[in-house]
Design a protein with these regions (language model features):
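Bacterial N-terminal signal peptides that target proteins for export
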Residues: 1-11
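Bacterial N-terminal signal peptides
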Residues: 10-21
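Non-catalytic cap/lid and distal C-terminal segments of serine-dependent acyl enzymes
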Residues: 19-328
Length: 328
């Protein structure tokens, strides 16, 4: 084998190892258990079920997990608030169960800290839940396909006051983006260790994270990345662009991050806190001890879920049974 061929193989091997290592570094860490699923058409109340719907926006089936409240079958005239939960990078709709979030919510409910609501977690690939410049339209898949389908198919109250969105890591970007672009649709937005990116990565950056982010962002914002498109789909800028509508909606904002976040996301989260303060936008922000990922989220989940539940309660409609709509 000649010298040039050996060099080419060596460089290719390093590149493959680099991307694999960074992908593993960015994936939220926690041991995964095999999810338990049911073959029934409707979810078992209190348990997690997996389903899908045809999505025009992404040109294929949009998979999702759904959890119905324990009283769903027993109290057949009652409608419920709904939470849309967005997973992080390298995840899918099953993360919500196998990473322990569903169990954490059930525990909070059993302890009387929160009440009953429906939870839906769609599969978002590594899309950042936006309409990619040259790819799939995940913002439209959620806003135009998923939410109408869920609220037609299940007994959801279906008012902005009883609809919430939440995300972890990359899903935090997505939750904030969708909430700020469509503030009239949600009562609350809550995030844990949101993957906020205040600027495009330096194309000359040689560190592993910069190179991986450049590769990822190129698939979403164009190659080379389109700066204007990046700002138009970045919650750190969208909040300013749509500030009047956000304030008018009265949407409640909560976010937190670990002080020892291994991706350094505590810094852009702190900057985001400062920006919202300067914009005069009410919000709640916390830095808690902890790293990045699912284990961190579970350790502080009571803060965000009590926050969204208290805002659901402010509407009052879920505290008593709501009569079924005609034709249900």
């Amino acid at each position: 084998m000649d010298l040039l061929m050996q060099l080419a193989i060596g460089i290719l091997s390093v590149m493959i190892t680099l991307v694999a290592n960074v992908a593993a570094h960015l994936m939220p860490r926690q041991a995964a258990a095999t999810p338990q699923t049911s073959s029934s058409a409707q979810p078992t109340p209190g348990g997690v079920q997996y389903s899908s719907l045809p999505s025009e926006a992404i040109g294929k089936e949009l998979k999702f997990a759904i959890v119905l409240p324990p009283s769903y079958e027993r109290d057949t005239k009652r409608r419920y608030p709904v939470l849309y939960f967005l997973h992080g990078m390298n995840g899918n709709e099953r993360e919500f169960e196998r990473r322990g979030v569903a169990a954490a919510i059930s525990k909070l409910r059993d302890e009387g800290k929160i009440g009953e609501f429906i939870i839906v977690s769609p599969a978002g690939e590594n899309s950042f839940y936006l309409n990619a410049k040259n790819g799939l339209r995940y913002e439209d898949a959620i806003i135009k396909d998923l939410i109408p389908y869920i609220e037609k198919t299940y007994r959801v109250i279906g008012t902005p006051a009883t609809r919430s969105i939440q995300g972890i890591s990359m899903g935090g970007w997505g939750a904030l983006l969708l909430a700020f672009k469509h503030p009239e649709m949600f009562s609350t937005v809550t995030t844990h260790c949101a993957a906020l990116v205040p600027a495009l990565p330096n194309p000359q950056g040689t560190d592993r994270r910069s190179q991986f982010m450049l590769q990822l962002i190129g698939r979403i914002f164009g190659d080379p990345p389109d700066e204007a498109y990046f700002r138009a789909a970045n919650p750190m800028f969208v909040v300013e662009q749509n500030l009047a509508a956000i304030k008018k909606s009265g949407i409640k904002i909560y976010f937190d991050c670990g002080e020892q976040d291994r991706l350094g996301l505590q810094e852009p989260n702190k900057a985001f806190d400062e920006k919202l303060t300067k914009l005069g936008l009410a919000h709640e922000f916390h830095l808690f001890p902890g790293n990045h990922g699912w284990e961190y989220m579970i350790s502080v989940a009571d803060h965000s879920y009590m926050f969204l539940w208290n805002n659901f309660k402010a509407d009052g409609k879920h505290t008593t049974p709501v009569r079924s709509r005609a034709g249900d």
